[in-house]
């Protein structure tokens, strides 16, 4: 009887425990878009490999591996449907990283011009409204520092 109860519980947990209902849409997805060619070429598998200012976009602790006094990066990607994604990052390592590495980043997305619509009781089910131009912008300040040869910390305020 005990095994039977376990099997019933196991079956119910498989059936109902994996339910994944999408209740809403997520925002700020532009923050997760690859911002540089090196990351894009490696399918974003860059979490532990950063040593430039671009680490601000995925792992700010990577700033601590920077060997130059400063680093600047600018990238611009034109996507389908007229979407334009621009990124800028700058990092500075005063005193050869003795005090850590400071960084600054900008992200901008221009989604182009879109036609607005509204639900309406007609044969199409909608009417056209005016056109609009959505965009998104993020700015961040970051810091990274090595605590040992194999351990670094970092963070960013956006």
Name the predicted role of every residue range.
Residues 1-4:
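Positively charged n-region of N-terminal signal peptides that target proteins for export
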Residues 18-158:
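Subset of outer-membrane beta-barrel
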């Amino acid at each position: 009887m005990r095994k039977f109860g376990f099997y019933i519980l196991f079956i119910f947990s498989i059936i109902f425990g994996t339910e994944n209902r999408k209740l809403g849409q997520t925002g700020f997805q532009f923050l997760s878009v690859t911002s540089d060619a090196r990351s894009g070429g490696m399918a974003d598998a860059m979490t532990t490999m950063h040593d430039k200012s671009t680490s601000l976009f995925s792992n700010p602790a990577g700033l601590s591996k920077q060997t130059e006094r400063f680093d600047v990066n600018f990238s611009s990607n034109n996507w389908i449907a007229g979407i334009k994604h621009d990124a800028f990052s700058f990092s500075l390592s005063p005193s050869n990283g003795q005090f850590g590495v400071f960084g600054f980043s900008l992200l901008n997305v221009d989604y182009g011009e879109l036609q607005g619509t509204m639900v309406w009781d007609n044969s199409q089910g909608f009417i056209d409204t005016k056109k609009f131009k959505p965009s998104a912008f993020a700015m961040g300040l970051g810091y990274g520092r090595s605590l040992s040869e194999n351990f670094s910390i970092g963070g960013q305020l956006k």
